[in-house]
Amino acid sequence: DAVIQSDCVRVVTDAAGKPPTVPAGAEASAIRPVEPRLEDAFVALLREKRGTEGGRAVHALPPGRATAPVARREGPAVEVHGVNRKFGDFYAVRDVTFEVAAGEVFGLLGPNGAGKSTLFRILCGLLPPTSGTLRVAGLDLRHAAAAARSRIGYMSQRFSLYGNLSVRENLRFFSSAYNLSGARQRERTEWALEQFELAPLSEATSQDLSLGYKQRLAMACALMHEPDILFLDEPTSGVDPLARREFWSRINALAQSGVTIMVTTHFMEEAEYCDRLAIMAEGEVLALGVPSEIKRGQRSEGRPEPTMEEAFIALIEERGRKAPAA
């Protein structure tokens, strides 16, 4: 098993400990052993029981575009500068600034109430900011929110499916919401059923699907109109580790095709799958950068090689010490 982890690839070998084959162009010295995680063992056991079907990487591209990646526009795909969102006197998002490059997997990590979902709704044009500037796919959200929404896909943490509709009907409904019809709609529907392995369940109602299949369907619905940018709000909550690993294979395939991915999560291991990461708490960004850089920034005598969880806790505790007394 293997998964892209920020600026490296994490490979799980068999019990014999046989080292992986070095890819062409890679240095053998770049391979180093690491301690296995509980998730690694759990995924290996699940794969052994279920077989490897369903764990394959997926090329998240429509028919006819398998060799034509998304054209990367000049400049950042997402620009956020000094954004605030207040509800009365309460700041849900406070002075947030960052940029996301085209084709980048950018993560927002934080506890419940950190402001991640509020910021996502602002970026999707669903909630106006109190102040600050935002550009998505080169469009100013204050003046061209409708045009920007046509360029993005959004998958909420509750999946937002219509339970009484079949899998196929959900795909048709969401595609029609983005003005797809006729042959193009049929083509995209068949693409989604094939690529997300939903064809055997195409006539099942979405309320009868397992959580893992609901996740697949929700992502397929968000991609029906071929968005340039995909927003995923805690998309793997409640699914098993194997389904989560498969989901990240799809995310990486999308990013490699040029789609920009923004994802919120509270899973520490998932945060390390992102190219870059912003750690949020109480509406503010506490750290921004490559996951390995964020971890190195929290080294101390007692934590010479901090894990992402240890770095996260250290940042939260540091913020608590600096916060003014009530």
Task: Give the ranges of each region predicted by the language model.
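ABC-family P-loop ATPase nucleotide-binding domain
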Residues: 30, 35-84, 319-326
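Conserved catalytic motifs of ABC-family nucleotide-binding domains
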Residues: 226
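Conserved ABC ATPase "signature" region
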Residues: 172, 176, 183-201
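Catalytic Walker B motif of ABC-type/P-loop ATPase nucleotide-binding domains
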Residues: 230-233
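ABC ATPase "signature
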Residues: 288-289
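Hydrophobic anchor residue at the start of the ABC signature
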Residues: 219
